Amino acid sequence: FCAVAMHSGVAPGTADSAATAMAAMHGRREAHLPDPPQALAAVGAAMAPLPPLLILHGDADNVVSVRNAAATAVLWAESLGARAGPVRTMQRGRRHAVRVTEYKARGRAQVTLREIVGLGHAWSGGAPGLNYSDPAGPDASSLVWAFVARQFKKI
């Protein structure tokens, strides 16, 4: 993979059963990556090192805790030797504001965390009238597409 995107998910390694998945969703499990030899055996050498990651998560999500987004960002960034930059707040028009943190290594963003202010458990920027969709959020589909396209340009 040249890029990974995650919207309202849990960090790798936080669950290994239905019960631990529920605890992970509520932010009550610690995130961890498998030991490198286990990870390579499981997914092959193509996943070493980890690709850049985009994380989108609503700070009002009462199903999957936003703590998972931050835990994933830190875990992924640490594995790539990336450090957090300053948090920037962005807002376009009447859409929900977004707190953006970029974790950089070697001058490049390796992890981009976008915490969407006021977004519950819904697809950000989704179609109106659909379940689990919030049209007032930034357009997650466009953000993911643009992020992945930028990563393809680097290979």
Language-model-detected regions and their locations in the chain:
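The feature captures the conserved acid-bearing segment of alpha/beta-hydrolase catalytic domains
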Residues: 11-109, 115-121
